[in-house]
């Protein structure tokens, strides 16, 4: 007797097709290649198109327009509202952006149908856990780790429990309107994280901290973009904080893939602290390096 195929709905946000022209095709190909037993449908939400737009891109792939007011978060809200009660016809909902494979995406190669099926047994959301060395606070909530918003899977019930995915709107008391000191003195963001955002988005690359691939100078002209991008980052963090507040654990994709492949079908998998989960990446890296060294020692001629 065959098990019913897992039903997954992807809500893929894009802003036009100039930067990632084949994003939805690449994502669908990944599902077909790595998860052929999954019944996959996709709703592409383009926040460069008017809200009333609607068309079909392909069989099982629908396109709608959305507001770009809060980037992917307001677009996801639009997609959820468009889907309506049909959202609960799926086993998992997949939040993604067109940049899902743009940065450090090796973990995506590990996801398969077994990982998705095991997720159904958890009270958790699956993605790539990012973290900072030092804890910080936003809106009085301590944070140190979060799920990268470009690729997250969870159950429809978990998603619906969040309501709107826009946690930090334009009226949030954060920004001063002054490019020389863009944050209000009473902004509900720790000073260290304010400095991180400034350096990440507008830094010159000096020092140990890395900077954003599209960094820019902060001027009166670029201030609105800075505020929008900073709010998007804060919305990403708050999405994780709200999931945690609802009792939904963070599940790292690399960790889960390793556990599923190592466990027997009868064994249960407990979700450990995020620090334990991300340490598995270091083990994977060490294993790959060891394999490379063994191959080189076997195939490369020795120096005399």
Regions of interest found by a model, annotated:
Residues 1-304:
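ER/Golgi luminal nucleotide-sugar-dependent glycosyltransferases, focusing on the catalytic module
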């Amino acid at each position: 007797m065959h098990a019913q195929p897992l039903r997954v709905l992807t809500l893929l946000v894009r802003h036009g097709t100039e930067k990632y022209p084949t994003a939805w095709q690449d994502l669908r190909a990944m599902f077909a290649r790595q998860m052929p037993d999954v019944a996959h449908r996709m709703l592409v939400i383009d926040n460069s198109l008017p809200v009333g737009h609607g068309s079909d891109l392909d069989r099982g792939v629908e396109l709608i327009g959305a507001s770009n007011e809060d980037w992917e978060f307001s677009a996801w809200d639009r997609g959820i509202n468009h889907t309506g009660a049909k959202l609960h016809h799926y086993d998992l909902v997949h939040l993604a952006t067109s940049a899902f494979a743009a940065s450090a995406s090796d973990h995506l190669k590990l996801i398969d149908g077994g990982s998705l099926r095991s997720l159904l047994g958890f009270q958790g959301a699956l993605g790539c856990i990012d973290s900072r060395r030092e804890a910080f606070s936003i809106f009085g909530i301590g944070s140190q780790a979060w799920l990268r918003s470009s690729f997250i899977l969870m159950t429809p019930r978990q998603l619906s429990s969040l309501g709107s995915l826009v946690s930090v709107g334009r009226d949030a008391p954060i920004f001063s309107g002054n490019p020389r000191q863009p944050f209000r003195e009473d902004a509900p963001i720790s000073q260290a994280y304010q400095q991180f955002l400034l350096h990440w988005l507008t830094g010159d690359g000096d020092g140990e901290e890395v900077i954003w691939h599209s960094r820019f100078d902060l001027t009166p002209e670029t201030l609105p973009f800075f505020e929008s991008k900073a709010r998007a980052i804060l919305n990403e963090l708050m999405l994780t904080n709200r999931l945690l507040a609802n009792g939904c654990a963070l599940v790292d994709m690399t960790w889960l893939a390793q556990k599923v492949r190592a466990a027997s079908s009868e064994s249960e998998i407990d979700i450990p602290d995020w620090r334990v989960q991300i340490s598995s990446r270091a083990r994977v890296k060490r294993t790959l390096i060891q394999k490379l060294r063994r191959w080189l020692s076997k195939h490369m001629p020795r120096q005399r």
